[in-house]
Amino acid sequence: MTLQLAQLEPFARGGNRLCFVHPDDAGRCVKVRRPDFTLEDRRRKKGFPKNLKPLSSFDDNLEESRVMTGLEKRYGERIFRHVSRCYGFVDTDFGKGLVSELIRDGNGAISQTLKKYLWDHGLTEECQAAVQALGDFWQSQAVPSRDLLLHNIVVQRNNDGTIERLVVIDGLGSSGLIPAGWLPHSLQQRKSARKVANLHERIDILLGQRGQDTFPGFHGLLLHDDHPDHHNEKGGPVSP
């Protein structure tokens, strides 16, 4: 069965992909390649020698699926305390889509990114504690990742608005040429510690920009939050 997504409004748009609420499961999302930005376009933008790689190496969905399979095999269930789950591929009218866990707040709304939370509320005491918990987990478990970007982390909140946890939804996997699992554990931990330190630097930079009139960039903003109270009479989400 092919999922029909073209008539739906994506809730998020990245540089390479669109994210839709799964039509049959509100607890999952479907990530598809943006039709206006092909794999050929991505390869063309890369310089030598990266532009010599096969097209499949530029497919974010294939890479994410590979990485998530490896993380689950290595860490088991505990990785999903701070990382969203991956459920494999499905056919859509945009081509192959990757199905992932859709993190929602206690009130049913899609969880906002850490970037948006910090912009709206600043580094509150409970947010600081949540960032610390994520950082401690990342370093102790030596989770392999690229840079921990603020728009790739979501803040899951309880029904009363308090923070339940932070969840990394993108940017996972080894950032170097050598797979992280091949390195000594102490070196893996040091690499993870640098990623956490860089996260704190990004938080400080964003907090310094809060006096601006406009949100910095479009990354980190939801196109809609799919809150049950925000649906129109036909059941579709209403844009903010």
Residue positions per predicted region:
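Conserved N-terminal boundary motif of the eukaryotic protein kinase catalytic domain
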Residues: 2-10
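A short glycine-rich, hydrophobically flanked beta-strand micro-motif that places a catalytic Asp/Glu
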Residues: 82-89, 144-157
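Conserved catalytic motifs of the protein kinase core domain
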Residues: 25, 95-96, 164
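ATP-binding glycine-rich loop module of kinase domains
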Residues: 15-70
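Conserved structural core of kinase catalytic domains
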Residues: 72-130
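C-lobe/activation-segment region of protein kinase-like
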Residues: 51, 117-131, 136-146, 155-240
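Feature marks short, surface-exposed loop/turn motifs that line or immediately flank catalytic pockets
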Residues: 36-38, 93, 106-107, 172-176
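Active-site ExK catalytic segment of metal-dependent nucleases
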Residues: 29-35, 101, 170-172
